[in-house]
């Protein structure tokens, strides 16, 4: 039949029979008696017990829930230290129950035990990645060495440290003593698979699929035109709501310090001090800067439509502090 049609659907749920000779009774609602954590790798699981509890949406003494089972799988999949998880249930054998008048009667057990088997990843890995570069005909090479620990404090915290070096032979520059570009950087990142913040209840932390991230980096660039040093550090939160296709990011604090120890006189004369080429944006990029910002981001994606919103505030808090302490203002209007 072409087109859309509405139909009425009626579901008749037959009562439960243990066997062909047993009477029909209401379907029992099973409760979880015990939750057991088992290791597939060794005698013990290399995760703190509280971490296991926070990742388990199933609860002892509560009815079985398919939604809670799926959330438990999802929560363990988020942990970088966990390789895979298998959850099985075993029904508690039928037992005698005591009625109100003290008589014993046989009844169908409504309890089952939950067994969560966990296999963990190797905690530490080292990766080396070489690169070849070609920037407008200038050939170069780069290499990075990354160390990762996926279970730093036995809570699936992930620590990564990356060392990187790059070299490029620059051609076609006139009036500069050095014709090579070198860059060295080190970056460290520590990710906690939970909210790290005061005044949050335990139930709130267990419900949220959040990450807390601390990062710091140092970058050294030596170009024929200038030398630049950049230090950055940030503390941010990320969490998701899969049912609503939402992802959130909150940058609580993001600090960036840019230091220019040396600028070539040729570069100053041709670009920064030349009246024809001089502009505020160009000069701003080659000054010593200290930037503090906060930011909030929201993204939505359902596989068809995608929306992203970002809001940032930079310098307001730092400006207020400098005014409160009476920092001096230089000729360019900057507080020092």
List the model feature ranges, each with a label.
Residues 1-134, 164, 169, 203:
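Periplasmic polypeptide-binding modules associated with outer-membrane biogenesis and secretion
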Residues 3, 43-47, 125, 176-336:
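Transmembrane beta-strand segments of outer-membrane beta-barrel domains in Gram-negative
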Residues 6-8, 53, 71, 109-113, ...:
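Transmembrane beta-barrel architecture of outer membranes
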Residues 55-58, 72-75, 79, 146, ...:
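Generic, well-ordered alpha-helical scaffold segments in large soluble proteins
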Residues 63-67, 137-138, 176-180, 225:
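Ordered, soluble secondary-structure elements with a strong preference for glycine-centered loop motifs
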Residues 79-83, 118-124, 149-158, 197-198, ...:
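Secondary-structure transition/capping motifs at alpha-helix termini
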Residues 127-134, 140-196, 213-215:
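Predominantly transmembrane beta-strands of Gram-negative outer membrane beta-barrel pores used
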């Amino acid at each position: 039949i072409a087109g859309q049609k509405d139909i009425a659907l009626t579901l008749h749920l037959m009562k439960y029979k243990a066997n062909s000779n047993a009477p029909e009774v209401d379907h029992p609602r099973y409760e979880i008696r015990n939750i057991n954590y088992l290791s597939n790798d060794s005698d013990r699981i290399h995760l703190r017990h509280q971490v296991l509890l926070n990742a388990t949406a199933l609860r002892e003494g509560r009815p079985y829930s398919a939604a809670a089972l799926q959330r438990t799988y999802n929560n363990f999949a988020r942990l970088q230290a966990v390789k895979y998880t298998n959850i099985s249930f075993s029904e508690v054998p039928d037992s005698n129950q005591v009625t109100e008048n003290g008589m014993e009667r046989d009844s169908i057990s409504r309890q089952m035990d939950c067994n969560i088997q966990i296999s963990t990843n190797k905690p530490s890995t080292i990766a080396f990645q070489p690169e070849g570069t070609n920037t407008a005909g200038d050939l170069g090479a780069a290499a990075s060495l990354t160390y990762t620990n996926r279970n730093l404090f036995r809570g699936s915290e992930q620590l990564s440290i990356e060392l990187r070096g790059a070299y490029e032979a620059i051609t076609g520059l006139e009036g500069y003593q050095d014709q090579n570009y070198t860059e060295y950087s080190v970056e460290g990142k520590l990710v906690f698979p939970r909210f790290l913040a005061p005044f949050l209840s335990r139930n709130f932390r267990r419900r949220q699929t959040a990450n807390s991230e601390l990062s710091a980096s140092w970058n050294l660039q030596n170009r024929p035109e200038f030398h630049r040093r950049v230090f950055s550090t940030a503390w941010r939160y990320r969490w998701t709501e899969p049912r609503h296709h939402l992802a959130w990011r909150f940058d609580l604090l993001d600090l960036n310090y840019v230091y220019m120890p040396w600028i070539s006189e040729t570069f100053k004369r041709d670009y920064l001090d030349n009246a024809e080429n001089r502009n505020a944006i160009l000069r701003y990029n080659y000054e010593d800067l200290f930037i503090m910002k906060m930011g909030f981001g929201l993204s939505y994606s359902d596989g068809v439509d995608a929306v992203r919103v970002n809001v940032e505030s930079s310098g307001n808090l730092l400006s207020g502090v400098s005014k409160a302490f009476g920092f001096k203002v230089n000729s360019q209007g900057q507080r020092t």
